[in-house]
Amino acid sequence: MFKNIVLVGLISCVLLSIKSQQAEVLPELKISANHRFFQADGKPFFWMGDTGWLLFSKLNREDAEKYLEIRRKQGFNVIQVMVLHSLSETDFYGDSALNNRNIANPKIADANYPNNYWNNIDWVLKKAEEKGIYIALVPVWGSVVKSAHINQNQAKTYATFLANRYKSYSNVIWMNGGDIPGSDSIKVWNTIGNTIHAIDPNHLITFHPRGRTESSIWFHNEPWLSFNSIQSGHRNYSQDTSKNDLRYGEDNWRYIQNDYNKTPIKPTLDAEPSYEKIPYGLHDITLPRWTDADVRRYGYWSVFAGACGYTYGNNDVMQMHNPKDKGSAYGSKDYWYTSINDPGAQQMVYLEKLMLSRPYFERVPAQSLIAANQGQRYNRLIATRGKDYAFIYTYTGRNMDINTGQLPGKKIKASWYNPRNGETTIIGTFNKLKTAKFNPPGQPANGNDWVLILDAI
């Protein structure tokens, strides 16, 4: 009898262990049937990303798990991380990523050796997987390729190593490039993209471009590119003067609009807008800094224009600024473990919740809903809709005239959605008119942002 009890107990433990391991495997991310969005197990997947560029190189395992857990609780489901920021890259424990700074010769070790650079990446990936978080891996930062003159053979060897090592992980996304124009070393970028795609065809791949550009400029028709990324960047309207850029200023919705109209259809998102608490234009730390209101604006503007998600960033968190740093970049003043709870980070989940609150895959940009005066710059109104609903975003809380007659049904239920706290205030239900006027709560001002929700009845 005792032996039977022990045997049953052992079997139960094994089954629980298997079940636990299976629960850690995340569903494969795929492109939706209409090629506009992501899906996981056929369900909508809204990319709610955070920028954790130096996670692998600057945090120990305890802090890495702390970071991931906080972001999980805040609703983030993707973290963008550099694999190699430089050829001299080391991790928190001092272990080098490469032998002799040779990208074609990674310094690997037995899987049981805890302080190996690559073993630590493995560990972080597994922890993220347990928490339901996908990791967008940037194989090598753009400046490394440009300055070190990495050739195609080295790139292929390195990409082969990465793809083989991480193709079995359920939570990997590939983010080729790294703050660089695709035209700079384009053969290397195509080599990395093609190599990873050939070995690991089941994981999505994109390209992280230079500020004020979009991956579609160079790679839209490449078979390895699953979806587009833009970097609307960190400059304000007055700073966007470069002749070589698209010069959209802060209007990140324009980049999304460009990608949305391209064929073949591919999803697109803003993978690097202005970071919370980073100076306007990055480099002059005496200038004002972007706030939570700004990161909300970039999020709602881009998503309502047709993006499949959005990546948030924070100046202190993206560089994992901590007391051991000899200095900081871009005037970072606070430590990552404090800034991780900044207002903008806590407000991002309300964007995700709103987008998933209505039928998702049918959603399209819908500027024709705005009857008059779509507005310029901060006064721009951005509209999106499904078959029976519509969302219209105002950053300044200004009055709006809406073509409610475009929605089906005889009645319209109207509500205000607050992007700062996720609360919904019902305006009322009324007989459908051709056009209707709406006046958001509060006085018009930058950051008094609201979403008008219209539901057809």
Predicted regions, residues:
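Bacterial Sec-dependent N-terminal signal peptides
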Residues: M1-A23
